[in-house]
């Protein structure tokens, strides 16, 4: 199951679409952000965060550098550069027996990257509300 989700996730990252993302998320998915204090619960809000992150990382040479999968979990380390700032992070993705994502946790370093992502994600989320 992990390999299927991993392949779907990579296909989504290569050609992001709301439809593809929606098909991977459990209705009660939880999104845990490095820049929001409380976990965000539910498919609509998780989609909003992940789609906004996709916009933030557009044209950043985002790439996964390491991937580990075991027992209903994918852990994928990533790197990117935004506005000349290096970003290193980890996506920790839990999934159920149907292959649907039940929790998506993002961890990011260094602190300058966290601060920049907080600003850029805020801008994207505001733009999404206005649209």
Q: Model-derived features: where do they sit?
A:
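Short, flexible active-site loop motifs that bind/organize anionic cofactors or intermediates
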Residues: 11, 36, 104
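A solvent-exposed, acidic/Ser-Thr-rich amphipathic alpha-helical stretch
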Residues: 18-71
